[in-house]
Amino acid sequence: MSFGTKLFTIKNKMDIGNAIKTLRKQKKITQKQLAALCEISTNALCSIETGQSFPSKTTISKICDSLNIPESYLLLFSISEDDIPEDKKIYFRNFGEPLKKILLDE
């Protein structure tokens, strides 16, 4: 794993949790329901959503399957403008946020 990849992973721990929470609420699923579907404890899911822990690849797959979304959606929702290099931010502003709204049906 390169330094950039490690930095991206560390930087996005909380964002992935927020993305899971946003998508879960959009689907009108409680933490308890999603945790049961993913075969993890409610405390574990809460810890992920609050950024206290980072989900494993297996857990990410289970969460995405349970929410009926591709993993790429979760990655898109976990990216914030702060994660984008300065020279690419214009693209994120023009496409990233509007795309998230379309996917959320807002």
Question: What are these model-predicted stretches?
Answer:
Residues 2-26:
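A short, Lys/Arg-rich alpha-helix, primarily the initiator
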Residues 4, 76-106:
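Short, charged recognition helix plus adjacent turn
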Residues 18-35, 62, 89, 96:
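Short basic helix-loop element that most often maps to the first helix and adjoining turn
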Residues 20, 34-35, 45-48, 74:
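Conserved hydrophobic/aromatic packing and binding residues within compact polymer-binding modules
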Residues 39-54:
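Recognition helix of helix-turn-helix/homeodomain-like DNA-binding domains
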Residues 49, 59, 78:
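DNA major-groove recognition helix of helix-turn-helix
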Residues 56-73:
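DNA major-groove recognition helix of helix-turn-helix/homeodomain DNA-binding modules
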